[in-house]
Amino acid sequence: MGPYRVLRTLGAGGMGEVYLAERADAEFEQQVAIKVVHGGALGGAMHSRLKLERQILAQLEHPNIAHLTDGGSLPDGRAYIVMEYVDGIAIDLYCDSNRLDIAARLRLFQTVCAAVHYAHQNLIVHRDLKPSNILVTAAGVPKLLDFGIAKLLDERQARQHTLAVTHADIRIMTPDHASPEQVTGQPITTSSDVYVLGVLLYKLLAGSGPFVITSVRLTDIERAICERDPRPPSQAVNTDDSDESRSIAESRSTNPKRLVRTLAGDLDNIVLMAMRKEPERRYASAQQMASDIQRYLEGRPVIARRDTWSYRSSKFVKRHWLPVTAGTGAAFLVVAFATTTYLQSLRITAERDR
């Protein structure tokens, strides 16, 4: 691949393969990651998406975002991009293997928020902020990777790529790390990344995700993400004496009961505010979310508040209006029947007593 010699395969996916490579022209020693798109029927669309990713990466210069090094085309016409090679592990595995406590996890997460906010300032939405796309080096530096399904918010730039990538871009997502807007095909804004940051923080804190999604059917995914309210992270932590519960707590340098107490309250509210179904009710930005976490770390009041009972009830009725209406009608009929029966019995008793 040009001046690069492939050493091994790092991974493969729907768009193509990623290789570890090094310079082969003796100019200087450098290991890089090279992404090559698939050929075949979707080759044209994937080629356009890789060009878009190259354009996106070229705009980003941030210490916590893997930077673009080079790019080109192979003799068979397939495009490739050359990126900084990040020798690290997924952020959730890094936190667990290093037994980071909750405060350390929050500080690491704040660094990720800063990188995401920087991308947003450059009118770029990542759309795939899962743990495997955020690697942490041995030095503890997180690096945001894979802008392969990112979205440009600049209409003039986006218009140049829209027609070419439309068919390859239909609801591309990781289901358990997707926002309601992604699942339903609604317009994507920076708020979508804020939602997924909430999902990521949920897992870093509680050791599991907010939803268990085993089906690949879109209707099942929509039902899970768009209709069900996630449990607060503190309620996702088991306080039993199982090996799994102890393992999750110990990887956070605590015990299950203390972990629940730590998460309950402000941290629950921070995560749930980021994950609200309605984009306008989430944090206004990744930076605002990071700032609220800082308030928590400093022992100051946070802006996140738990939804009121009346609000949750109204949203439940809106989502399930048909069964609620039917149930309310049935309950009314039961009450009306019982009231009528009771009044009739009173009249019969009164007449008998006369």
Regions found by a protein language model. Name each.
Residues 20, 29-38:
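Glycine-rich ATP phosphate-binding loop
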Residues 22, 51, 55, 65, ...:
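C-terminal lobe helix-coil module of Hanks-type protein kinase domains
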Residues 90-100:
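AlphaC helix of the protein kinase catalytic domain
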Residues 38-59:
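AlphaC helix of the eukaryotic protein kinase fold
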Residues 33, 81-82:
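Conserved hydrophobic/aromatic residues on the N-lobe beta-strands of protein kinase domains
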Residues 307, 315-354:
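Charged/polar helix/coil "stalk" or linker segments at domain boundaries
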Residues 17:
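Conserved N-lobe ATP-binding subsite of Hanks-type protein kinase domains
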Residues 12, 60-63:
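Conserved N-lobe motifs of Hanks-type protein kinase catalytic domains
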